[in-house]
Amino acid sequence: MERKFRVSAGAIIIRGDEILLVRAKNSDGNDFLVGPGGGVESDEGINQACIREVREETGIEIRPYKILFVEDLVWQNKRVVKIWFLCNVIGGELTRTQGAIEEGLIEARWFRKDQLKNEIVFPAVIIGYNWGSFIEDNWKTQYLGIENSAFDL
């Protein structure tokens, strides 16, 4: 079986003690939270894809400035390598955009860590970290290994 392969960009956006996440549904109809992001188009860089996807899904303008994680996901006949960037907000206004509606996203909003206790969150690794540590200069990019995706890629 031939696998479809794609590269994707995701945004980790921290504001004080909050993180910006979007709520989506998987193919089973269960909802989950994930950092905004999506596939890289053939004519753009990974950082440009991150900027575009965040704008399309949230209305927020960002600047990616550090790679935090590299995620390697498998789902049926698909494989996605996702680069997670730490991003600064530089403009825009959080809104439910037309792009988000078309993608089936339910909401985009800021969450405190205590609000995520009973939620399914991707990348799951972010729950275990002090989000302030992402900003530190000595942060080393982490490869998260190959995982089966919990949702359709």
Each model region followed by its residue ranges:
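A beta-strand edge to alpha-helix "cap/lid" segment located at domain peripheries
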Residues: E2, V121-A124
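Short connector loops at helix/strand junctions that flank enzyme active sites
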Residues: R6, I14, D28, G35, ...
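Conserved Nudix-box catalytic region and its N-terminal flanking loop in Nudix hydrolases
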Residues: E18-E56
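Unchanged
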Residues: V40-R63, L73-F122, F151-L153
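Charged phosphate-binding loop/patch that engages nucleotide di/tri-phosphates or the phosphate backbone
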Residues: G128-L153
